[in-house]
Amino acid sequence: MDEIRIELDCISDKTIDVKGIKYVPIKNSNSERKAYTIALCISNRGRKLKPFILFDGKGTNLLKQLDPKNTIIEFTQKLNGSYMNADLFKKWCEKIYDAEVNLEEKNNSILLLDNCGSIHDKFSPKDTQVFFFPANSTKYLQPLDLGVNKIFKGKFKIFWEEWMANNNKTTSSAYTKSMDRQTFIKKY
């Protein structure tokens, strides 16, 4: 299992314009601090488990509107932001790992986690060995970082660029309105 942070302003660090130009305007939504966290996991047989999406704040109306069938959505306290903590990890284990990994897979499975302090040694799923990657080594060892997450982020960036190009709604400060959670979930 690995968490990825999806920033809602995926502004590129490169621009294209005439050489020597001192100011290049960039269209953005001024939402640099707005982000969601998605926990992804693949079973030992290569099957993708349901994603676990963390939004900050409350969202009871959002869940009623969307009714996502292939996704588990949780809302976190504002102080936590949309980061995984021990309680949310326990919910992930119960709602996704224990529910989706059948008994045959569990007897032979290990759960590989990055060395995240918020979940370290706090809770582990039933019938599963949990191993933590050494600190600062996940970019070399974590299978999800090396494959699935990179592809997911790349596809989201393409979607975001298309959305920004076609979105003409602006705020009173003349910024493009940021992508809402409904748009994000429907696309995902």
Task: State what each model feature region is.
Residues M1-Y188:
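RecA-like helicase/translocase P-loop NTPase motor core
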